């Protein structure tokens, strides 16, 4: 079985870190042990600097980051990560487990920010070509639940401080995109933790078994 790229998506407070741990545990039980982990934005020295610029509310002082500048910084970080980390890992037979990928931009910037979705799709295709995750787990929570969890973790970053309306639009776009793409599996992350973990285990196990079929 060739290596695969699995991405975990969701609003702030959806439980992506816990989900990643469950994915890793499940893959190991299935005999898959050669894995690397990525996060977006970030994952390389350059991409981490871009992450700081786009997420740290104090990174550019009083200067307002425009919506299109934000998108371009996300894509600069993403293509650097894909070309220097993700693709080489996959080529070497290593599975890649990612905390966010392009679906975040389509949902947050296309839904939350209201940036033209055709422009985003064109930009994605120009930068990434036909490169896509093999499996995406979208952890669905309401903004009320997710932001309550995020606030309990401590200080919020620039995007986490957006309004409930922003996150409602983002969630709606996530759900819309998930309904259009069979590689995106939606997990109800408002359930009790054990139920969420069981749903992730079942989804990943069944998906891997289908690869072997």
UniProtKB/Swiss-Prot annotation:
Uppermost EC category: transferase
Coiled coil feature spans: none
Catalysis performed (reactions): dTMP + ATP = dTDP + ADP
A GO CC annotation given for this chain: cytosol
Record's keyword terms, sorted: ATP-binding, Kinase, Nucleotide biosynthesis, Nucleotide-binding, Transferase
EC number: 2.7.4.9
InterPro entries, A to Z: P-loop_NTPase, Thymidylate_kin-like_dom, Thymidylate_kin_CS, Thymidylate_kinase
One BP term from GO: dTDP biosynthetic process
Source organism superkingdom: Bacteria
Function, in words: Phosphorylation of dTMP to form dTDP in both de novo and salvage pathways of dTTP synthesis.
Family the UniProt entry places it in: Belongs to the thymidylate kinase family.
Protein name according to UniProt: Thymidylate kinase
Organism, scientific name: Escherichia coli O127:H6 (strain E2348/69 / EPEC)
Lineage: Bacteria, Pseudomonadati, Pseudomonadota, Gammaproteobacteria, Enterobacterales
Gene (UniProt): tmk
């Amino acid at each position: 079985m060739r290596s695969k790229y699995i991405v975990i998506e969701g609003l702030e407070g959806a439980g992506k870190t816990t989900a990643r741990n469950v994915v890793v545990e499940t893959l190991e039980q299935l005999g898959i042990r050669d894995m690397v982990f990525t996060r977006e934005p970030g994952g390389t020295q350059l991409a981490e600097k871009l992450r700081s610029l786009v997420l740290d509310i104090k990174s550019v002082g009083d200067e307002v980051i425009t919506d299109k500048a934000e998108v371009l910084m996300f894509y600069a970080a993403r293509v650097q990560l894909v070309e220097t980390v993700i693709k080489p890992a996959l080529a070497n037979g290593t599975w890649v487990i990612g905390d966010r990928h392009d679906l975040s931009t389509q949902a947050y910037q296309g839904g939350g920010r209201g940036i033209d979705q055709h422009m985003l799709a064109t930009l994605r295709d120009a930068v990434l070509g036909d490169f896509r995750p093999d499996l995406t787990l979208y952890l669905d929570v309401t903004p009320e639940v997710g932001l309550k969890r995020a606030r309990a973790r401590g200080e919020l970053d620039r995007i986490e401080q957006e309004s409930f309306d922003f996150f409602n639009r983002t969630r709606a776009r996530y759900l819309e995109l998930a309904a259009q793409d069979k590689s995106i599996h939606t997990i109800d992350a408002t359930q009790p933790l054990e139920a969420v973990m069981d749903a992730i285990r079942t989804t990943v196990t069944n998906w891997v078994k289908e690869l072997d079929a």
